[in-house]
Amino acid sequence: MATRGGGAAGRTYELMVLGASGFTGQFVVQELARVAAGDEFRSSGLRWAVAGRNRSKLEDVLRRAAEALGMPQLKSEIDIIICDVGDPSSLDAMCKQTTAVLSCVGPYRFYGEPVVKACVENGTHCIDISGEPKYLEGMYFKYNSQAADKGVYIIGSCGFDSVPADLGVLFTRDNLKGTLTAIESFLSFHSGPEGTCIHDGTWQSAIYGFSDQDGLRKLRKQIGHKPLPIIGAKQKRRGTVFYSDELKQYSIPFLGSDVSVVKRTQRYLYENLEEAPVQYSAYTTVGGIASVVKLIFAGLLFLLFAKFSFGRSLLIKYPKFFSFGYFTKEGPTQKQMNDSSFTMMMFGEGYSEGQDPQQGKPNVKICTQVKGPEAGYVATPIAMVQVAVTLLKERSSLPQRGGVYTPGGAFSKTKLIERLNQNGIQFTVITRPEA
């Protein structure tokens, strides 16, 4: 069994951004360039490159990053590697040159696995920003043992899905004196006068994910995990649409990967570190009754069309129409991103020190908050890059074995939360029990 041996020393690059010319990839390039020029790498430097199919598009990404950051040297100093996800030999050649790949090649259900496979086979770590539970859990099922043997870390969901939620649960747990047994999170998005939108790549992932729910159920049956033990009182699930007294808004269950990722983290911590698992539910606020009506109508359309091939093709072709403008082929403008932010409130409950969680009702509560800039294309690159930096800088604090990990599973013993705090994604305690 290999331990912490992947990402062989002496490779040309430490980090490689694959899919750098994609909509999200371009912002990952900008964030990585900013961090590489910062204090942490001022003396040692950071060797990194960009990779993709089209040289001219990659050159354009570097040019725009150079202009945005006032760093003209990027255009000449950052190497470009030509690589096609559909060409295994080009993936192998790329992986052999770098310690870790930052994979921005979504939808991951179509393009993610070849990258993971090449990374595992070539002893290269892989970080992605997928929010697709079937892909994430499928990579665990297929590659966890191989990655462990190679000493390689494959770490998924390292963007807005699901770093704030996964690390937020750990932050909340660590700030409660006693045993945290359950958390509800409420995610709110904030935008400026021009509103906001999301690039349709995320929309496509949602469409395909919904249409393949049976596949996810079958995969989980194949994995065959036993249910996690419930510590303390069993958490009650909310309705499909409900009014949140905590946030004074209507809310719905969060449809991303957060619940899947957090549950996998809690399983890893319970089975490997004997830490008490935390029950977790995730919700999104939607505002007042008018927003609820609009959401229900859009949701019914989505449910109807996503079931059939022809309907899915219409949803993909006309994202702006079917999502009421929330998803577009162009993505948000820079002004929209500058004016947008997110807040995730976490309401936890548990048992005080000395109190048996199996006896009686929870007797302590805690409220924490994770907040940051625009979620998809500002916070996501921040999270992804800080995950990569932590992987490079704190290898000894990662799990002893390689494998396919969640962010919380990989980084629970590192300073990742501290790094995120320093770079714009802030974790704070709002209220805690009296000592």
Please give the residue ranges for each predicted region.
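C-terminal catalytic/substrate-binding lobe primarily of soluble NAD(P)-dependent oxidoreductases
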Residues: 2-12, 174-435
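N-terminal Rossmann NAD(P)H-binding glycine-rich loop of SDR-like oxidoreductase domains
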Residues: 10-38
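Structural motif
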Residues: 14, 99-100, 125, 366
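Glycine-rich phosphate-binding loop and adjoining beta1-alpha1-beta2 segment
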Residues: 42-75
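Conserved Rossmann-fold cofactor-binding substructure of NAD(P)-dependent oxidoreductases
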Residues: 63, 73, 79-111
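ADP-ribose/adenylate-binding Rossmann-like module
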Residues: 103, 107, 116-136
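Rossmann-fold NAD(P)-binding glycine/threonine-rich loop
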Residues: 112, 130-152
